[in-house]
């Protein structure tokens, strides 16, 4: 039986003591290999509750090795079964809060590019108690998809701070990506930012600004360079 098969068997029976014992028996080289196997082959096969329970135990065993396993959340996000309202998520948050609080934001940074809906992102922030809007913006900037641009815009509207808005724009401009540039155009128009060191082709009329974040589809419509449907 391979190490992967043994791991899958132990996880399937929720034998966490046996899992810990096995991981402790691995050499440094084997543990590094197991980190990849867990992230790429084992965790992506687990249903929501077992996913979070497994992640809790392996991060508790060795945070530095297994924290990145959270990126395997993508299969749950994609099929719509992702749920942060579980006891294992609560316990994982408490464990990180006590042992290494900065890992909470690190984990969110790795997770947010894999999420596919506003509800999922909101659930992540609530479950891991990321309550400060500026911190949320920093996390959202780790993703490079339309959903993150939409939530960045909504968060900036909520806090209404031109300095923060400009910093977000500068971060997006560095991507040299058409979608990111159009997101900057929206932020620039809403906040009246006139000193950004870049040229933009998308123009937004003032009367259109109140419609941009009406819903995600409308926002994406504008990101594509189209006029919002009013």
Task: Give the role of each language-model region.
Residues 1-183, 187, 192-208:
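Non-catalytic all-alpha helical scaffold/repeat segments
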Residues 209-230:
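Terminal, non-catalytic domain-edge segments
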